Amino acid sequence: KPTKLTRTIPTVSFDSGMVFERDASLFGKSTTQTLEPRLFYVYTPYENQDDVPLFDTGRSGFNYAQLFSENRYVGLDRVSDANQLTAALVSRFIQEDGAERLRLAIGQRLYFEEPRVRIAGEAAQQSRYDLLLAAGGTISESWTFDSGVQYDAAGSSLYSSNVSVQWRPGKMKAVNAEYRYQRDSFRNIDLSAQYPISRRWYGVGRVSYALRSYGVGQAVNPSTGSKLIESLIGLEYQADCWVFRMGAQRFVTAAQTTSTPIFFQLELNGLSRLGLGNPLESFNKSVPGYTRLNAGIGRP
C-alpha cells in the first residue's frame, strides 16, 4: 500500500468588480456606502479522491465568504470540482474609522456542470441556478454577526443557510455560536470560545453538534438523528518568556469511526516551538477570533 498520497488539481478563477461610493447615514451615524457589482468564475476539473482518507473535512456553511470561494469544503481532504459563475451585488456601510458596520449581498450562481465530488451524506446539487443572499456586520462594539442563504430557484426551496454571532468583549476573549443547515445533508450547531481562566491560564474549546444528520457519514443515532460530531478542549499558560499549550480533539472521520488526537506545545517567545502535534493550528481552525497569547512578540 502507498504510504504517501499526492494530488495535483489545478484551479482557474476570474474575479472582476467595480466599487462606487456615496455618503450615507446608518442608525444616525455618518457612513460611506459602497455599491460593488462583482463577477466571479471558477473552474476546477474533476478528480476522483476516494483513495484519500476523510479526516476533518466538511461542507462549509454558506456565508458571504462562500460567495467567492474556490472550494466549497473546509479542510484539505477534498478539493471540489467546479465550473460555475457567480454574479453578485454587494453594498457596505463603512464608518469614519474604517470599520465595516453592515454588509449586504445578493447574487446568483450558474452551474455549467453539476459538481461530482461529494462527501458522505452530502446532497447532490439539483439546480443549475441558485439565488444567494448574505448579510453581516457589527451589532455593537463587541458583537458581530454573519449570515447567508442559498435558495434553489428551480425547486423553489431552501438549499442551505448559515447564521453566526460572535462576542468579543476584550483581549483574548471570543465566544462564538453558529447554526448551519444544508438540505438532506446536515443541521448543525457549533459553539466555540477562547477565554481567560486566571491571569496566566486560558481555556479554548469547541463543540459541534448535529441536530439532524443524514447519510452514512453522520447518522449514528437513529432514535433522535442527533450526535456530537466534533469537540475540542485546550489549555494555555502564558509566562513572561514562554507559552505552553495542550489539548485534545475528537471528531468523526467516517461512519462509526472517531479520531482523538492529543497535542501539546512549548513555545519560547521569538525562538522556537517544541511539542507533539500543532495545537495552534487546531485552535485557529476551530475557534473563530482565536488570538495567539504572545501575538506581536515575534513568531519562531
Region spans (language model):
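Outer-membrane beta-barrel translocator/pore domains, especially the C-terminal barrels
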Residues: 1-300
